[in-house]
Structure formats: C-alpha cells, structure tokens
C-alpha cells in the first residue's frame, strides 16, 4: 500500500502570525513559525536502513541530528525512530516525496506523519540559550548542547523536542517541536521569555 502523502496548508499559529511584517535588522532573539515546512517521521528496527537506502545520512546515536546535502535535517530520536525536516526549497520537495513514496512492506519501517501532530518553531540569535534557561531545566549552552544535539525534554511545562540546528558560521538556531494543540500557548510563553533579549517575531 502506497502512502498518498500529506501537505499541510494551515499552521496552528496562523491566527497569531498573520499580521507579522519582515524586520530590517535583528540584534536579539527572533521567533518564527516554521510549521508549514515539511516534516515526517519513521519508526521501526529497519528505519535507519530504509532512510539510508533513500540516500539519507543517518546519525549514529540517539538525540543527534545530521544535515543532508539537500538542506534537510535527519533527527534520530531513539535507536528506531527518526524525523526528517525540510529547511530549503529543495528539501521541502524531497521530504514530501519521501513521505509519499513510503509503502507498507516487509521492511520494518513505519510512517509517522508529523505535519499535524507537531508545530515547529525556530529561535535564532546569540542569546537563545539564556532565553531557554527561563523555560527549560536542561543546560542548552553551546558547551553542553553543541550544533547537532537534540534534547527531548520539558519546555515551559510542555513535552518538546529541542534541536540545535546551527550551521557553521551562522547565528545560533534552535528548532522546537511541540504538540500542535499547545502551539498557541507555547508561542506566547516563548514570546514572554524573549522580551528581555530584544525579542522579535518573524513572519513565516
């Protein structure tokens, strides 16, 4: 059985981000809704091999993330569970194709649609670790939480996946994935926390 794929067209934060305007300069922390970007999950004892068969480089250990040549990010959540997230136009298409191309077969790799289940927020700026310290008990400083690290933890009392998605030579960047039903509340909690760090909201 082939999966028809799914493309999300509305963010759970659309009512909060609709009026946002681009900003000319950003010196502090920025918060952006990335929920319209493609993302998909896979689970099973052969999920790593299935992803490698489709050209993806898989992190060796759990709670690690690896950038791909198409601009997507593969996140390993456990020995047998992965998430693939798009961060470019090319990877948006490839991640959607990856989801649509999955078929139920004898291979122990099972599709976990993530467009509806998880909202996706981006935090950028030099002070994001200090800002997150107000919301999360885990040490997310650069020394303890380097680029490519993943934490499955509580942020603002909500179960969250935190990914250090920083690239070499670019500003610090965290991706936060949380239950879509909590997206609006979580957005406001992050907004309150970034106030003292010259926080700004960015449009999608």
Summary of predicted features, one role per range:
Residues 1-204:
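Basic, glycine/lysine-rich polyanion-binding surfaces/domains
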């Amino acid at each position: 059985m082939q999966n028809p794929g799914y493309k999300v067209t509305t963010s759970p934060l659309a009512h909060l981000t609709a009026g946002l305007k681009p900003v000319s300069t950003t010196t502090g922390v920025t918060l952006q809704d990335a929920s319209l970007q493609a993302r998909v999950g896979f689970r099973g004892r052969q999920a790593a091999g299935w992803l490698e068969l489709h050209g993806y480089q898989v992190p060796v250990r759990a709670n690690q993330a690896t950038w791909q040549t198409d601009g997507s990010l593969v996140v390993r959540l456990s020995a047998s569970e992965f998430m693939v997230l798009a961060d470019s136009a090319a990877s948006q298409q490839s991640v959607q194709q990856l989801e649509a191309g999955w078929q139920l077969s004898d291979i122990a790799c099972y599709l976990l649609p993530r467009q509806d289940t998880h909202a996706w927020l981006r935090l950028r700026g030099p002070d994001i670790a200090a800002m997150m310290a107000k919301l999360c008990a885990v040490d997310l400083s650069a020394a303890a939480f380097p680029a490519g690290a993943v934490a499955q933890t509580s942020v603002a009392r909500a179960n969250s996946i935190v990914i250090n998605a920083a690239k070499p030579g670019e500003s610090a960047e965290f991706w936060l994935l949380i239950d879509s039903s909590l997206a609006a509340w979580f957005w406001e909690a992050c907004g309150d926390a970034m106030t003292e760090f010259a926080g700004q909201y960015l449009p999608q």
